[in-house]
């Protein structure tokens, strides 16, 4: 593996040396590829345009990131920014010099790449949804073919930029981002075939949230009992990150787990709340849908500004869970219900 890692470091050095002027683009690509964008931007937009696609986005994102966590615990992937300092591969000679950035010092294992995996799953859902809409609208065959090729090429381009950005930032090795793309696409393909996710009961949301959380915690405890330290990466991040403030607890494995579980549970609460059942029976006009999107995104932006101290880990994790749940309640229930009260709309019903 050292040889493979050394090739990855050489590529990172090459990218940082030759393409430093694109640092802003790479930083943007990594930021947008984070699942935070899915929960706080893409979901509220898709939910008020095409509900089934929005639900699929959340399920793919949550299941994919949960699997990413488990795989990282199993694969023990290194990260370039600390590996280059600790490896004996370079012997007595000088190790390559890698630049670090504010988003470099993630605290979890590196394989597979969560950004590449999440972006692959989310884009797969959106591309297949757009192609499905084109088929429903009976798009002309030639136009559909151009659309088909164009959308998949766009997804490929986005994934390429995301992968390059993760290597450029010295956060991942090339093989880790490739593994992320493959795994994320497979998760999206499998989850997309499941029809029950569109009609899951609140009980099922609760049980799945409980199962995924319990499995991850149980797996952690089991490996801990076998004397496997799953938090080994935290020490490396704190040791080798050049700026202590760049090491964030919200990139730790359990922080990610609780955020995702909060999102899934919040989605279940939102879809089965009395407020949602009231608005679901109403015919939403285009202006009202746009209003829901704009207000939801605005409120989520305000919610995103709510941060809390990581000094007490249990409190931090609990608040992360609650914040993520509220982030899904806002676009699914609270905003549509409030707008329907302010601007009464027609209720669906059968013609007699």
From Swiss-Prot:
Q: Where does substrate bind?
A: 79, 166
- Catalyses which reaction? D-glucose 6-phosphate + H2O = D-glucose + phosphate
What Gene Ontology molecular function terms does this protein carry? glucose-6-phosphatase activity
- In this entry, the parts of the chain located on the Lumenal side of the membrane are 1-27, 78-113, 163-166, 227-256, 311-324
Q: What is its main location?
A: endoplasmic reticulum
Q: Which residues are named in the active-site annotation?
A: 115 (proton donor), 172 (nucleophile)
Per UniProt, subcellular location reads as: Endoplasmic reticulum membrane
Gene Ontology process terms (BP):
gluconeogenesis; glucose 6-phosphate metabolic process
Side of membrane Cytoplasmic, spans: 49-56, 135-141, 188-205, 277-289, 346-352
Q: What is its EC number?
A: 3.1.3.9
Per UniProt, what is one Pfam family of this protein? PAP2
Q: Where are the transmembrane segments?
A: 28-48, 57-77, 114-134, 142-162, 167-187, 206-226, 257-276, 290-310, 325-345
User: What keywords would UniProt list here?
Assistant: Endoplasmic reticulum, Gluconeogenesis, Hydrolase, Membrane, Transmembrane, Transmembrane helix
- For the motif Prevents secretion from ER, what are the positions? 349-352
Q: Which domain of life is it from?
A: Eukaryota
GO cellular component term, pick one: endoplasmic reticulum membrane
Keyword flag Transmembrane: yes
Q: Which InterPro entries match?
A: Glucose-6-phosphatase, P_Acid_Pase_2/haloperoxi_sf, P_Acid_Pase_2/haloperoxidase
Similarity comment text for this entry: Belongs to the glucose-6-phosphatase family.
Query: Mind telling me which PANTHER family this protein's record contains?
Result: GLUCOSE-6-PHOSPHATASE
Role this protein plays: Hydrolyzes glucose-6-phosphate to glucose in the endoplasmic reticulum. Forms with the glucose-6-phosphate transporter (SLC37A4/G6PT) the complex responsible for glucose production in the terminal step of glycogenolysis and gluconeogenesis. Hence, it is the key enzyme in homeostatic regulation of blood glucose levels.
The name this protein carries in UniProt is: Glucose-6-phosphatase catalytic subunit 1
Q: What's the source species for this entry?
A: Haplochromis nubilus (Blue Victoria mouthbrooder)
Q: What is the lineage of its organism?
A: Eukaryota, Metazoa, Chordata, Craniata, Vertebrata
Give the encoding gene's name. g6pc1
């Amino acid at each position: 593996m050292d040889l493979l890692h050394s090739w990855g470091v050489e590529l990172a050095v090459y990218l940082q040396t030759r393409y430093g002027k694109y640092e802003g683009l790479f930083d943007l690509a990594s930021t947008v590829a984070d699942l935070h964008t899915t929960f706080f931007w893409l979901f509220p937009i898709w939910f008020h345009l095409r509900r089934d696609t929005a639900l699929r986005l959340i399920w793919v994102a949550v299941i994919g990131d949960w699997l990413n966590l488990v795989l990282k615990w199993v694969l023990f992937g290194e990260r370039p920014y600390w590996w280059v300092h600790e490896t004996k591969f370079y012997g007595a000679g000088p190790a390559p010099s890698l630049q670090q950035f504010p988003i470099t010092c993630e605290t979890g294992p590196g394989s597979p790449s969560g950004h590449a995996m999440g972006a692959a799953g989310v884009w797969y859902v959106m591309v297949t949804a757009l192609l499905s809409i084109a088929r429903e609208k009976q798009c002309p065959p030639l136009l559909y073919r151009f659309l088909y090729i164009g959308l998949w090429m766009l997804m490929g381009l986005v994934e390429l930029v995301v992968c390059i950005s993760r290597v450029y930032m010295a956060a991942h090795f090339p093989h880790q981002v490739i593994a992320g793309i493959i795994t994320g696409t497979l998760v999206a393909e499998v989850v997309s075939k499941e029809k029950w996710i569109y009609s899951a009961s609140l009980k099922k949301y609760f049980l799945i949230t409980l199962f995924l959380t319990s499995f991850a915690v149980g797996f952690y405890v089991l490996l801990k009992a076998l004397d496997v330290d799953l938090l080994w990466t935290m020490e490396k991040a704190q040791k080798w990150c050049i700026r202590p403030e760049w090491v964030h607890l919200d990139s730790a494995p359990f922080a990610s787990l609780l955020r995702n579980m909060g999102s899934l549970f919040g989605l279940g609460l939102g879809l089965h709340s009395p407020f949602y059942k009231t608005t679901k029976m109403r015919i939403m006009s285009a202006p009202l849908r746009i209003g829901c999107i704009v207000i939801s995104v605005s409120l989520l932006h305000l919610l995103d500004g709510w941060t809390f101290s990581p000094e007490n880990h249990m409190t931090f994790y609990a608040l992360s869970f609650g914040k993520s749940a509220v982030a899904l309640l806002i676009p699914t229930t609270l905003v549509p219900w409030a707008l329907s009260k302010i601007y009464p709309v027609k209720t669906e019903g059968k013609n007699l």
